[in-house]
Design a protein with these regions (language model features):
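Structural alpha/beta core scaffold segments of enzyme domains
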Residues: 1-238
Length: 238
């Protein structure tokens, strides 16, 4: 009764193509190119166009996200976290708790399976535990249930792509263009790095003399997607 909440419904965007049309981007688009695709199309005997779509993927690590924070002397805090990036936990905890990094100790006894899902995504739960410890001066543990973990954490990035590919009479690839629409979710997380890896892997194992690839990291109303084995490479090669 002491808190009054006013909620206004806003448009929900979950399709990266729709987000791109409305300029809802995590950061500016990137384009990689080689040769001259515009000139190459005229020399191609066969040209194909189409779309490709790849969905997200749950990490399903053996143990869910979790952290345990304990108060030490002189305002120091020790965080036991299932993170793949202990320095990120230390740096973020110091910023949120407004203390020096030297006052935050991060231990990683075991991860319990990660596959990329406990890089940046492990940090919020560790910070919640640390903040509770700072306020209460008592040990605090935060462990997600499997259902909450699957609902609240990011997955492999879904992609939607437009492609155009041209072949010579001998069926050698002469030119290739593609536009990637990455579904980043609501915040950046590792989406910029994942997107650039997609561009680096866009031609798979082939040498194509004329290439142009553009990628958009699209902001949608979903949990921020994150690293997963391959880190954007599989989406680019697909």
């Amino acid at each position: 009764k002491l808190v009054e909440i006013n909620i206004s419904e806003k448009e929900v965007i979950v399709d990266p193509r729709e987000a791109q049309k409305k300029n809802q981007l995590i950061f500016p688009p990137r384009t990689f190119f080689l040769g001259d695709t515009e000139s190459a199309w005229k020399k191609c005997a066969h040209v194909f166009k189409g779309q490709a779509h790849s969905n997200g993927q749950e990490h399903l690590y053996i143990e869910t996200q979790g952290a345990y924070a304990v108060p030490l002397e002189n305002g120091h805090i020790r965080i036991s976290s299932s993170t793949q990036g202990p320095t990120a936990v230390q740096r973020t905890a110091a910023k949120v708790l407004n203390v020096g990094m030297h006052k935050i100790e991060v231990d990683v006894v075991r991860i319990g399976g990660g596959f990329g899902g406990k890089e940046d995504q492990a940090t919020p739960w560790a910070i919640m535990a640390a903040l509770g410890t700072q306020i209460l001066n008592k040990p605090v543990k935060v462990i997600l249930s499997r259902l909450d973990d699957m609902r609240m954490t990011g997955k492999r990035h879904p992609y939607s792509s437009d492609y155009k590919i041209g072949f010579s009479k001998e069926l050698k690839i002469m030119a290739y263009e593609t536009i990637f629409y990455q579904n980043a979710g609501a915040a950046a997380d590792l989406s910029p790095a994942v997107m650039e890896r997609t561009l680096f892997h866009g031609t798979n194992s082939y040498f194509i003399p004329n290439v142009k690839m553009t990628a958009y990291s699209c902001k949608t109303n979903l949990p921020p997607n994150t690293a997963f084995r391959g880190f954007g490479g599989p989406q680019g090669m697909f």
